[in-house]
């Protein structure tokens, strides 16, 4: 009897060892509640695994035909080239997180090399820029990105007539806690791919952006339980934590030392656009800085406005020649005269009433509480008071977390609150006073003889987080094409929720000082609602005198550009 028990225990232990070391047959993993099919073994390589581009280019006759067609259609010596100025790979913190196996739509790592292959062979762009988040770079990843674009350019053929031109830059991902200290996200682009003509390290923002928080301390690590629940992919989960540790170990740069004199392996940041511009000037390399996603309420605080940014300290017309009007995160072009909240004559924030074009989220907060209250059988007058209180409580929140004043709310309860109804694919929770039209209409008359104003050329981009440059050419495969992501299923959502403090639905609202975004973790952002308003990305078009790097860059500097919603128009 003891011998049989011993054999059974040995077999069981052996089974567990095989299971937890990813050596058991696939059917054995089906007993685990978090199991999902992975026939392609998509997570074999991690974002830390070195990758190389495909060592080939498009046939010469394809490039010749493309050039001749565009020259003929334009009737000009210039041709229209299409590209993507905003591409993230899994070298970005949020993209790495979205690629984890327990996220729906995920299918493994998308390193910088994939961006070249996708842009060259799938979307067949003429140029692209890598722009991973500066806040989540390690020195190795910055150098990996540079080498990737150099590989892409080395296989492009004649530099005067390449099949594609690869550029590099980074995203300065600033997010303010309130409208007064919010400047927003900007892409910093460089002309050259020679490491000696590029900063030795990116310059990050100072703020509370997702990419910033995600990872520069050990607190950004994922729980070890993920690898136990999904042992087939434990190495991938572990690689995320290894990467977080590398970032946490990167020392902060000395702010008193000029940027070019700093060691390459330190973390440098700039709090404002003006500080960023000064640091870029210290390097002296040709660059363009492009604001983007300006109206996107996923991170933009209530009442955000271009006004506080339009001053001599934070404007550089030589750098900010372009602006991104459209991406997979939505349209930021159009101004509409509505507001998230408004201030009365006593200085109190109040909730505006709905219009035919716009349902304020604060108003819908009142409707949600009203419906819950009535459903419990309370008196109508009491429920009306609770509804009014809910609207008031919502607008007292100066950050993006107003929705948390409605405890336990679901995306469905909010309907289309926060979305303008007569704008083409508007960004989520639209902030109209950060729109491109509003910015162009403004002037600063501090110096009446030389007023300040913005003068932008328009570009579109994807803002893809899976290295799929120019993915808007076909509106298909939404989960893999767009950035719509989230936990894979209810089991994994339960795992995520187990470490967060989530409020239960109640028929009364919470005051601003009663919400706790930090404890809510990922649930402190309206990820599910945001996903409903994501789409495939846009494109940047340039009127260039040739296909080469100089011609493309010169067209961008001249503002001979336009943006599309993804198609070659």
Predicted regions and their residues:
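Extended, charged catalytic domains and RNA/DNA-binding interfaces, predominantly
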Residues: 5-9, 15-569
